[in-house]
């Protein structure tokens, strides 16, 4: 099928695999993989896509593919990835695949120079091209820009962000120290904010929005970094294969001995905050030798160093110190940072044990004394005060509204541990804030015209165990995905509709309900969490129960027991919840949600740290203390500062900033879970492409216009360079002249109501027009002026040609007048002399008759001399009369009188001669009369037969018209009956459509949930549960399930029959009911297949027409979307009709204009005809007759794929006036076009299906 062309079909690990269609099922296609001949599998028809003809070809912009679908998108990315081409476009969106190794020269300074000022598409896809586009858009549009770098953890967001910043500073910096500072700030931020996770060795555990500010000359003048949601829980605990923040390990590995002794550092395994995770350093062979043995943990000694081409703890420590120096940190401030980091490590080593006294509480273990001493020393605290603050909590009693006694409440071991960890998180969090503020101080700016912001924030995260950090990160990604949907999909389509471009609508998943679930006031999860924090005794269990109670029937929220992973099903309902995010379902364990949502310390700990002897420590907490003065509660109580709502506020401010700027998108893709090079896991990459919206963008860009400019903006940009005569032009007319002057192809752009739009891949042309360089604008104005001059000169030429044509027309008319005068004069002359001329003609005719006299005389036997004398005298009289007419003016009456006398003489003479031969002539005359009578009799019989046939045809046509009118009346009667119940039916259908739409959304979401669960299971070496595995089987839509249910009540269940089996049964079966059922199922599958072909046709090609549009104009969507129309029960009348009507033969003819000729010939001179012979409800023979083309003959069986697949009722032919013709009219055309020979050859090759036509031909041949 499909002429052996390959298609892409789903594959569980590769995403898609190439194969051939070998059979058509009820709702699926049977595929034979190209690399596994003989093996087949089923694939849902809407998950099969046509493949490119050259499977090894790759394109830089996926919009250039012949077939635009998710399979070709994935394959193109894969082919380019195998060639180390990690960047690909989808229109103006960049897809970046993480290579996990250094590609030579791809980010060199020469490469940077090669992209400067180049339009998107003129150079190979690159992150530099997006950065340059953002800069040029900022410069031309006078509008700040944003670059949103998104993707999963480990997809390469941080690296691509650094490349964008480096490109902007190197290309458009002022050459001063500030350019280097902006670039050098990254190593410092990464050291304090990045860490190794199971999915990424250099994962950013915070979000940042880096703004590069430019002056009016578009030169870099400074920058600013905003940061969001540092993962504070990582400071105290990490996973087994994960590490704490890089700074801890780099300080242990790279610090000098002097610093090491001052900070009392040792190997990572000696610190509680490091030894519960991975304690190995990142190092290569050279730096491994430079790390002293006493700094290596036993795990490092046993397993060796961690390997990553971008990470090296010892070398990165040196680079970090260099970066600190470049951004202006002196040695003292550098040591302050290290001192706080070391203080946090020693704080974590403080252990507690239960006190032996009856008062309860706890004490420090003896072995923790050194750690307490080191921590107090490094943080500038008193040892005793630190001990007391960690083991007790101060409470202040109240009496009658006045302050009472200060009471110290001893803490239990668990409470002390929590207090210690809270202090460590707070200290490190404030240190990180200080680092970011210090970075911002190193590149200040006084004034800024515009900025380019680069957003790098943690990607969508899904682990086996997910907590509050993952919840906030995924909430952020939901908001960013919504911004992407709004900017790229929603706003684009609204603009296309507003401008009247006629672009087809693209549907996408709206995640607003998920965002509302999290952030809506009062009942949102964040507000419920804040409310829980305000309770006297908050608990995670109570919070979780309230969430489930408030959102009991919410589609996006469910209980852990419904997870696809077995490990989550062990959770109780009050221990977690599942949120169905845009990328898939994630199970959150709510333990510590309440604690992590509070960013405040107990008053005793906060007072302790704020009163530190160390001025650097005090400075870290001063700003926080000032901000929270008004929010402090009574001593001893834990004041509440909501982390969730603080992040929500920051996020909304960020999105407001993004919405106020132009946006460019970089979608980073993680090629595999093992983080190895040249390994492409298609299924999980496909999931990333789908979740990032690339498939929807691809659908939109089939007819989209990613670049646009307002007529007035263009006009105003060029106005000051225009001469006065051009300035008078209308803006729209000027734009048209500009495009004509540049020689742009009209296919590449389209004019809207107020803007001009450019197709994907035409960014170079757009940039050429929008380039605001004065010399360039002046040059374009000259070209417009030149084009206008040339255009007007052509108009002058045309006018000259028109004048010449008018002159020739005048000359032609003068000659015509002369000809008319000549003709009139001739006519007047003829009218004057016509009697004499007519007389001469008649007399001349009479003279010619004398030859007949001579013939008669020659046959006479007697009296010849006398007769000859009489004839001679008659001839003399005739000559005399002719001479008289010529010489004298005689009237018509005179001529007639003398002519009559001569005629009488000649008749008398002739009658005398004829009497002698009367007998012979009489016999001859009788014979001729007899022949004439016989001929007349035959002619009358033929006329009678013709009239009889015409009468019969008129009678048949009247019967056909009467039948058509009767059918029309019956149809109208049925419609009237339907209208009476239309309100109920429409309401029911609306409910069904809504339910089915929701069901489709649920199925799509469950599919994403399964894919995400599978990826977690692969990563965590955990199998998906049996129920989840069962769900991975081929899923059927509700309509297909209804079809199967209906099949159980029918006599013949054909749902499992193959396409070939249906065809063979139709050709051989004698069971009328089975034959009717097979015909119906056969044509239903043809409808589904042709609908699939129409949806997946080649780009910029017309849909293949098997019949005129008026016949095939039915809705394709129900067949692709598994709508209830697929239910065979709904088609039962057609089957019953075939059984009841005993295969009535009907013939039709309607006009047929091919799509390619539709607009080329307005007068329909190339109109063809479409003939159809229906054997019962199904078509048996089909003809197409087109001018200048050989006729196309098709017969059922042999040509099913090219014939009309609709039944007679669905075509509407019976309701078309004048469409039905007589069998004789069809058969005449069929025979004349060679149909008999074509049908005979099909019968002999056993390809023709048994029909009325085949039976008649076989009888004729016998």
From Swiss-Prot:
Annotated ranges, domain Myosin motor: 57-771
Entry's Gene Ontology cellular component terms: axon; brush border; clathrin-coated pit; clathrin-coated vesicle; cochlear hair cell ribbon synapse; cytoplasm; cytosol; filopodium
Localization, UniProt: Golgi apparatus, trans-Golgi network membrane; Golgi apparatus; Nucleus; Cytoplasm, Perinuclear region
Major localisation: Golgi
Region described as SAH: 917-984
Modified residues annotated as Phosphothreonine in this record: 405
Binding site for ATP: 151-158
Stretches the record annotates as Disordered: 933-955
Gene Ontology terms, MF aspect: actin filament binding; ATP binding; calmodulin binding; cytoskeletal motor activity
Residue ranges, annotated region (Three-helix bundle): 835-916
Post-translational modification: Phosphorylation in the motor domain, induced by EGF, results in translocation of MYO6 from the cell surface to membrane ruffles and affects F-actin dynamics. Phosphorylated in vitro by p21-activated kinase (PAK).
Mutant lacking the gene: phenotype: Mice display hearing loss, hyperactivity and circling behavior, suggesting vestibular defects. Higher steady state levels of LC3-II, indicating defciciency in autophagy.
Domain comment quoted from the record: Divided into three regions: a N-terminal motor (head) domain, followed by a neck domain consisting of a calmodulin-binding linker domain and a single IQ motif, and a C-terminal tail region with a three-helix bundle region, a SAH domain and a unique globular domain required for interaction with other proteins such as cargo-binding.
Disease linkage: Defects in Myo6 are the cause of Snell's waltzer, a condition characterized by circling, head-tossing, deafness and hyperactivity.
Protein known as: Unconventional myosin-VI
Native source species: Mus musculus (Mouse)
């Amino acid at each position: 099928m499909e002429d052996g062309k390959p298609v892409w079909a789903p594959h569980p690990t590769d995403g898609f695999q190439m194969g051939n269609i070998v059979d058509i099922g009820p709702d699926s296609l049977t595929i034979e993989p190209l690399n596994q001949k003989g093996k087949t599998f089923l694939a849902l028809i809407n998950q099969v896509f046509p493949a490119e003809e050259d499977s090894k070809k790759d394109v830089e912009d996926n919009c250039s593919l012949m077939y635009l679908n998710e399979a070709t998108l994935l394959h193109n990315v894969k082919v380019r990835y195998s060639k180390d081409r990690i960047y690909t476009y989808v229109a103006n969106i960049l897809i970046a695949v993480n290579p996990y190794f250094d590609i030579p020269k791809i980010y060199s300074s020469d490469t940077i120079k090669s992209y400067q000022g180049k339009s998107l598409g003129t150079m190979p896809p690159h992150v530099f091209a997006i950065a340059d586009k953002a800069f040029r858009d900022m410069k031309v549009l006078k509008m700040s820009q944003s670059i949103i770098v998104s993707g999963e953890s480990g997809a390469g967001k941080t690296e691509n962000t650094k490349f964008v910043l480096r490109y902007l500073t190197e290309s458009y910096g002022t050459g001063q120290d500030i350019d280097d500072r902006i670039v050098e700030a990254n190593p410092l931020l990464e050291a304090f904010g990045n860490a190794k996770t199971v999915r990424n060795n250099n994962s950013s555990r915070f979000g940042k929005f880096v703004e590069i500010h430019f002056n009016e000359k578009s030169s870099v003048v400074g920058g600013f970094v905003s940061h969001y949601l540092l993962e504070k829980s990582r400071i105290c605990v990490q996973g087994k294969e994960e590490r704490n923040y890089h700074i801890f390990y780099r300080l242990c590995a790279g610090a000098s001995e002097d610093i090491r002794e001052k900070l009392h550092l040792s190997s990572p395994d000696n610190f509680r905050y490091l030894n519960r995770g991975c304690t190995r350093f990142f190092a290569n062979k050279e730096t491994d030798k430079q790390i002293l043995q006493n700094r290596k943990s036993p795990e490092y000694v046993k397993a060796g160093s961690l390997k990553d081409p971008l990470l090296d703890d010892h070398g990165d420590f040196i680079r970090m110190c260099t970066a600190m120096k470049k951004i202006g940190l002196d040695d003292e401030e550098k040591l302050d940072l290290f001192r706080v980091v070391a203080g946090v490590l020693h704080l974590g080593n403080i252990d507690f044990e239960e006190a032996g006294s009856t008062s309860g509480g706890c004490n420090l273990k003896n072995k923790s004394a050194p750690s307490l001493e080191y921590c107090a020393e490094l943080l500038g605290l008193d040892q005793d005060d630190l001990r007391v603050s960690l083991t007790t909590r101060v409470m202040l009693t109240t009496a009658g509204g006045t302050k009472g006694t200060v009471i110290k409440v001893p803490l239990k071991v668990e409470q002390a541990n929590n207090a210690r960890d809270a202090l460590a998180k707070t200290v490190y969090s404030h240190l990180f804030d200080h680092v970011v503020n210090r970075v911002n101080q190193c590149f200040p700016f006084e004034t800024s015209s515009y900025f380019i912001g680069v957003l790098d924030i943690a990607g969508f995260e899904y682990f086996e165990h997910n907590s509050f950090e993952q919840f906030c990160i995924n909430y952020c990604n939901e908001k960013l995905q919504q911004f992407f949907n709004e900017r790229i999909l929603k706003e684009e389509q609204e603009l296309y509709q507003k401008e009247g471009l006629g672009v087809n609508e693209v549907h996408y998943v709206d995640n607003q309900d998920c965002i509302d679930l999290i952030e809506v006031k009062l009942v949102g999860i964040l507000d419920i969490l804040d409310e829980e924090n305000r309770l006297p005794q908050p608990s995670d269990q109570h919070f979780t129960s309230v969430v489930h109670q408030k959102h009991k029937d919410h589609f996006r929220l469910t209980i852990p027991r419904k997870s696809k992973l077995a490990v989550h099903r062990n959770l109780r309902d009050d221990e977690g919840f599942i949120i169905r995010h845009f990328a898939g379902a994630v199970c959150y364990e709510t333990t510590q949600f309440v604690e992590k949502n509070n960013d405040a310390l107990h008053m005793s700990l906060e007072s302790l740290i704020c009163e530190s002897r160390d001025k650097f420590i005090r400075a870290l907490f001063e700003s926080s203390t000032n901000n929270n003065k008004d929010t402090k509660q009574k001593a001893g109580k834990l004041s509440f500062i909501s982390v969730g709502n603080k992040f929500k506020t920051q996020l909304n401010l960020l999105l407001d900033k993004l919405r106020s700027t132009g946006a460019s998108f970089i979608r980073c893709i993680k090629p595999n879970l093992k983080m190895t090079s040249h390994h492409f896991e298609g299924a999980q990459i496909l999931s990333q492409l789908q979740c990032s919206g690339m498939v929807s963008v691809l659908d939109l860009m089939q007819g989209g216009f990613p670049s646009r400019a307002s007529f007035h903006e263009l006009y105003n940009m060029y106005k000051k360079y225009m001469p006065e005569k051009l300035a008078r032009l209308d803006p729209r007319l000027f734009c048209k002249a500009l495009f004509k002057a540049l020689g742009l192809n009209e296919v590449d752009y389209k004019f809207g109501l107020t803007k001009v739009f450019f197709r994907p891949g035409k960014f170079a042309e757009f940039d050429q027009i929008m380039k605001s360089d004065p010399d360039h604008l002046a040059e374009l104005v000259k070209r417009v002026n030149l084009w206008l001059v040339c255009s007007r000169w052509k108009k002058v030429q045309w006018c000259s040609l028109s004048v010449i044509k008018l002159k020739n027309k005048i000359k032609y008319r003068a000659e015509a007048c002369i000809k008319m005068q000549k003709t009139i004069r001739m006519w007047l002359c003829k009218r004057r002399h016509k009697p004499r001329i007519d007389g001469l003609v008649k007399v001349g005719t009479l003279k010619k008759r004398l030859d007949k006299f001579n013939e008669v005389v020659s046959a006479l036997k007697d009296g010849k001399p006398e007769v000859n004398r009489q004839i001679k005298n008659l001839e003399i009289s005739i000559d005399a009369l002719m001479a008289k007419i010529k010489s004298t003016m005689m009237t018509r009456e005179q001529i007639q009188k003398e002519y009559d006398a001569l005629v009488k003489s000649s008749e008398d003479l002739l009658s005398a001669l004829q009497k002698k031969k009367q007998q012979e002539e009489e016999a001859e005359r009788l014979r001729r009369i007899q022949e004439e009578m016989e001929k007349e009799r035959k002619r009358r019989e033929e006329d009678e037969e013709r009239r009889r046939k015409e009468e019969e045809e008129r009678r048949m046509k009247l019967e056909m018209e009467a039948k058509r009118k009767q059918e029309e009346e019956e149809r109208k009667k049925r419609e009237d009956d339907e209208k009476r119940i239309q309100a109920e039916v429409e309401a029911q259908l609306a409910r069904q459509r809504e339910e089915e739409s929701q069901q489709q959304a649920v199925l799509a979401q469950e599919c994403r949930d399964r894919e995400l669960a599978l990826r977690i299971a692969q990563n965590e070496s955990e199998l998906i549960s049996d129920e989840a595995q069962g769900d991975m089987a081929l899923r059927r839509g509700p309509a297909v399930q209804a079809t199967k249910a209906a099949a159980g009540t029918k006599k013949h269940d054909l749902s499992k029959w193959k396409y070939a089996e249906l065809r063979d049964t139709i050709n051989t079966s004698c069971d009328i009911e089975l034959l009717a059922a097979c015909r119906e199922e056969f044509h239903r599958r043809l409808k589904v297949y042709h609908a699939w072909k129409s949806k997946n046709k080649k780009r910029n090609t017309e849909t293949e027409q098997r019949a005129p549009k008026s016949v095939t104009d039915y809705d394709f969507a129900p067949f692709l979307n598994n709508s209830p129309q697929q239910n065979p029960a709904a088609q039962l009348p057609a089957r019953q009709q075939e059984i009841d009507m005993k295969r009535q033969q009907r013939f039709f003819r309607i006009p047929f204009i091919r799509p390619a000729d539709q607009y080329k010939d307005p007068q329909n001179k190339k109109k063809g005809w479409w003939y159809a012979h229906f054997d019962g409800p199904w078509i048996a023979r089909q003809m197409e007759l087109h001018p200048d083309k050989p006729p196309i003959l098709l017969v059922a069986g042999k040509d099913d794929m090219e014939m009309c697949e609709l039944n007679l009722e669905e075509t509407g032919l019976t309701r078309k006036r004048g469409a039905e013709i007589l069998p004789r009219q069809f058969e005449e055309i069929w025979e004349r076009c060679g149909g008999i020979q074509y049908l005979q050859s099909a019968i002999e090759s056993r390809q023709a299906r048994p029909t009325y036509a085949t039976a008649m031909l076989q009888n004729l041949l016998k």
